[in-house]
């Protein structure tokens, strides 16, 4: 089978399954968040937590709940890592160092799963499921809750800014969506050979004749939510390139589908909740255009042959698993960087300059193609407001979106939400490059303008883009175990996650306080091909104006060498 045919069949299968799941999954999630009934287990949780499930919260009450819950989660995870040595199933592992524990706690609570440690030799089989896997569920549920709160801002009329109840949204997202879906995915992965074990490991003899210790862990259960919740942190160091996590081409497709399922179907949920499904289809079309374009660039770049090794192999196979090949690796890479997942089944640092630049650009677009669980929906909705504002300026009318006027307050909050990520990426990269002491941690270096120094810059840019977008993938040539990277990337993960959430919730409250205005002949249509083009152009223009100089110094310069 030719590589082109293999790529086409895999892409067609993924798109076909997503198309089949789009309506039922999207409508199911809409029913979950709009239901007035609580499950029995939910009622028990509310009673134990003294939560009034019928009480509504204003945006600042909702935001305070998000921040309070996330802070408590981070503290719990931090101290769990620090006392790991006295916990069950520690297998001789001591407590995690303060810097790594801090970075990891922020990383998993922020849905980033950036890993500056080797999982097999750092985290025990107790901390993995009790600490990290739990955060994989609840951090994803937090993102979904914030997205639904913003949607309520559009559909509620003069409600005093009430946008729902965070604790109810968190509980329903975890128990009704993430848990059952993860269970099904875990069973499928188990059938493909993904392991599920609490044994410490086993010894074997390698091909070179030396003894090898193979780590075992409860992988299947965590692998499912790792992908479904767009978390991405591997329970094994090689992540989804490891045969214990992703053993077959079919398991690879299942993991790609798990990554894309909820972000794609949330556009249907949005359309259903606002009462106009064309709105959701328009957002989905924009996501699809961006995702398809970057996938085409990545496939073309990786299928070419550049350099002696690539020419001999016929394609850029360095850093890729033979069982997946170019199509499975490129499809996974674009899926994982277009969402906030960050899981990898190949070495992104070994990709061609244009291929690596494409997955980097996928993050720099704001991870909206299709975006993370919840974060993708509220990210593209904020950009839709900017597009409507630009359209309103062109025709000289007050911009409106779904019957809500976009005044100074709304546009200011939308702009602030968009500006957080670029500021963190560019400032963090600039400071790191200026600091001469950090150059020793780059796997590539040299005099300015040489290929090594250019790729070294790309590694730093990728790291801060990944942390600030809560992605978690990396160009592995950069060593990030120093105190500078542990602290700076931790701050980027923290601010990149929670500052946009605060601005989005404030925006939801402002919208929910308004009355709806009836559309007129001069109202800009926000569904259909015209708005699809306007929104796509806005996304590309914002990213191009912001990041083109940095990309020109990194991937583009390397591609032109």
Swiss-Prot record:
Task: Say which family it is in.
Answer: Belongs to the KdpA family.
- Source organism of this protein record: Rhodococcus erythropolis (strain PR4 / NBRC 100887)
Give me the segments passing through the membrane: 5-25, 60-80, 86-106, 130-150, 177-197, 247-267, 281-301, 324-344, 376-396, 415-435, 491-511, 533-553
- Superkingdom as given in the UniProt entry: Bacteria
> Protein name, please?
Potassium-transporting ATPase potassium-binding subunit
Q: Summarize the subunit comment.
A: The system is composed of three essential subunits: KdpA, KdpB and KdpC.
Cited function: Part of the high-affinity ATP-driven potassium transport (or Kdp) system, which catalyzes the hydrolysis of ATP coupled with the electrogenic transport of potassium into the cytoplasm. This subunit binds the extracellular potassium ions and delivers the ions to the membrane domain of KdpB through an intramembrane tunnel.
What cellular component GO annotations does this protein have? plasma membrane
């Amino acid at each position: 089978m030719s590589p082109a045919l293999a790529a086409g069949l895999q892409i067609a299968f993924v798109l076909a399954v997503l198309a089949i799941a789009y309506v039922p999954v999207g409508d199911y999630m809409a029913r979950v968040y709009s239901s007035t009934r609580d499950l029995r287990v939910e009622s028990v949780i509310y009673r134990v937590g003294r939560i009034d499930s019928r009480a509504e919260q204003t945006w600042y009450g909702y935001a305070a709940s998000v921040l309070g819950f996330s802070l408590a989660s981070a503290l719990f995870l931090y101290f769990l890592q620090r006392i790991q040595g006295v916990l069950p199933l520690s297998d001789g592992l001591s407590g995690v160092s303060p810097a790594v524990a801090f970075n990891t706690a922020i990383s998993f609570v922020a849905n980033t799963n950036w890993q500056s440690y080797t999982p097999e030799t750092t985290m025990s089989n107790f901390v993995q499921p009790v600490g990290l896997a739990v955060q994989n569920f609840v951090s994803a549920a937090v993102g979904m809750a914030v997205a639904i709160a913003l949607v309520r801002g559009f559909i509620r009329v003069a409600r005093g800014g009430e946008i729902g109840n965070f604790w109810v949204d968190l509980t329903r997202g975890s128990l009704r969506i993430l848990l059952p879906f993860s269970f099904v995915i875990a069973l499928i992965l188990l059938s493909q050979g993904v392991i599920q074990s609490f044994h410490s490991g086993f010894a074997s003899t390698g091909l070179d004749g030396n003894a090898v210790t193979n780590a075992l862990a409860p992988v299947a259960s965590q692998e499912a939510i790792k992908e479904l919740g767009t978390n991405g942190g591997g329970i094994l160091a090689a992540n989804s390139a490891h045969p214990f996590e992703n053993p077959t081409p079919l398991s690879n497709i299942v993991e790609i589908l798990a990554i894309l399922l909820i972000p794609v179907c949330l556009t249907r949920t949005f359309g259903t909740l606002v009462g106009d499904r064309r709105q959701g289809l328009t957002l989905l079309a924009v996501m699809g255009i961006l995702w398809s374009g970057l996938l085409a660039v990545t496939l073309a770049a990786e299928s070419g042959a550049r350099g002696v090794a690539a020419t001999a192999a016929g394609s850029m196979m360095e850093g890729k698993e033979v069982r997946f090949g170019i199509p499975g690796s490129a499809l996974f890479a674009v899926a994982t960087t277009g969402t906030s997942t960050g899981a990898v089944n190949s070495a992104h640092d070994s990709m061609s300059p244009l291929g690596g630049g494409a997955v980097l650009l996928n993050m720099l677009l704001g991870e909206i193609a299709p975006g993370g669980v919840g974060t993708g929906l509220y990210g593209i909705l904020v950009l839709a407001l900017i597009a409507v504002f630009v359209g309103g300026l062109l025709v000289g009318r007050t911009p409106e979106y779904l019957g809500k006027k976009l005044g100074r307050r709304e546009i200011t909050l939308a702009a602030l939400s968009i500006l957080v990520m670029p500021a963190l990426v560019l400032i963090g990269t600039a400071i790191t490059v200026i600091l001469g002491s950090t150059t020793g941690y780059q796997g590539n270096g040299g005099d300015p303008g040489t290929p090594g120094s250019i790729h070294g810059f790309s590694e730093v840019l990728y790291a801060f883009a990944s942390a600030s977008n809560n992605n978690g993938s990396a160009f592995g040539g950069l060593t990030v175990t120093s105190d500078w990277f542990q602290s700076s990337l931790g701050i980027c993960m923290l601010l990149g996650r929670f500052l946009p959430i605060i601005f989005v919730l404030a925006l939801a409250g402002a919208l929910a306080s308004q009355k709806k205005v009836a559309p007129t002949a001069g109202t800009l249509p926000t569904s259909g091909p015209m708005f699809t083009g306007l929104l796509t152009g806005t996304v590309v223009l914002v990213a191009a104006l912001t990041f083109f100089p940095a990309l020109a110094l990194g991937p583009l310069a390397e591609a032109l060498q």
